[in-house]
Amino acid sequence: MLIVRPADSSAWTVWRPTGERLPIPALVVAYDDGQRLLAAARKGRATLELTLTVESPYLYDVWQVSKGRVPQRVVHRVTAGNTAEVRVGYGDTGAPWANEQRFGWRPWQEYSWNDGRRMVRTGTTRQEFVSAGGNWWQHRVLHTLGFDLWSKLVGGLTEQPRRYAADDRETESWYAPVVRPAVPATGTPVPTRTGDRLDLRVPEFVDADGHHGWARESGESATVEARVSRDGQQIADLSDGWTPVPTTAAAARYRLDVSTRRSSEQWRWATRTDTAWQFTSARPAGTAAVPLPLLQVDYRVPADVRGTVPGGRPHRLGLTLRQPAGVPAPTGTSVRVEVSHDGGRTWRTVPVLGHGTRFTALVPAGRGAVSLRVRAADRAGDSVEQTVIDAYGLR
């Protein structure tokens, strides 16, 4: 069905991949184009040939800049001299489509004018061209489709603001396993202590590339429990929000427990996580905020864009230990890894090779999904125990 709009009405429409599908497809054209189509139809049998692209393998985020002048005619040519190339993998966590938005602003701007989110099919890789130079960019991806296409994208995972050089050829992977609570390696936020106050903001969802997000902005229901203990006694419950925690001056042993629960058709991996960080802290000298030594584990899973690895043979799981920015790198480290193929009901210790901050675990063949339980510690007494149920899939 072809619908010709009146002369005083717009033919503008929006396609969405979700919703009811009618048995007869309909297309809308503007009045002037419609008149030519009607004239051709009146002359006899007319054929209309259409080429449609539902999911383009390319995307352009272009910023046209004219320094020190206002040109009479604005012309922008995308070239290798002014544009970076980024291959972006949009991870499939269960939903067939996702929202994404790359916010952009000039150095003198205080906020971005970008106001429209975009749709992208999950489980795909797209070649994206981004203007280089002095522009600031920040990419954000929500693992499913939101209800509003016109407001800025708030939820999901976010990268740190960055610039591109024209010769940059980079890759991004969104929602790559293992997604878990973590202090991002790419920057803020960093847990700190100022005097006798602890600021323990830890994003509940961080992927393998360091993109981070918060449960309250996740786009769907998630349960979070967070508690702080000092010398074995609970001193704060942060389950309702990350607020400063008052403490005492003397050196003490602290423990931060963070648990997440999220399971839906749109979220098949990392359905449950339990993380416990332990460290020692005393009142620091001065009034500046001092980063806290919450030992981190970064994971390197040889997964595809759907978050799965071949299950018919063993595979290697990479693990890297690090401290938050501002804390010396860990030394005298140890790592223990257990895996489960039945959702955490039974566990099996696996071989771990490596030293320093880089280790490799050999995960046995299996079916379904891999759950992980990792224990790591360093010479300073900092430790982390992290359990991720259904961390990634087996195909």
Question: Which ranges hold each PLM region?
Answer:
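Short, compositionally biased P/S/T/A/G/V-rich stretches that sit at domain boundaries
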Residues: 50-61, 68, 171-196, 284-310
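Edge beta-strands of extracellular beta-sandwich domains
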Residues: 263-285, 382-392
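Conserved Ser/Thr-centered positions that define the repeating blades of beta-propeller domains
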Residues: 229, 338-341
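Structured lumen-facing ectodomains of secretory-pathway proteins
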Residues: 1-154, 161
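Short amphipathic, basic-aromatic surface patches that mediate peripheral association
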Residues: 92-98, 185-217, 320-328
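Short strand-edge motifs at loop-to-beta-strand transitions and within beta-strands
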Residues: 243, 357-361
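Exposed beta-strand face motif in extracellular beta-rich ectodomains
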Residues: 252-254, 368-372
